[in-house]
Amino acid sequence: MAQPILVCSAHIHWDPEFCDVKLIQSMMLMEQLRQIMENFGHSFRPGHKKAGPESVQLLLCADFNSLPQSGVIEFIKNGRVPTNHPDLKVKDPLGSIFHDRQKLQC
């Protein structure tokens, strides 16, 4: 079986004043992509070996409306954002907010 690829197109909120909204939208996007990738093997090609999320390639095409030093880009690239990041207006007692997807190249 050829390696599956998930293609996602996204457009994140444009207004620089709402950097926290952009960050939350990006977090929600990554969580949905993680769920889709985890469920991938359950719904495609019955009778074949289940494809785990690590075997699915992700092509993320997005207008993040964010600068390279923004919380959005840091979250997408590194999988986490420290709670003292200027874009994050909500504090997390654990000290960081993260996703469990492998690092993505931007």
Regions found by a protein language model. Name each.
Residues 1-106:
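Active-site regions of metal-assisted phosphoester/phosphodiester hydrolases
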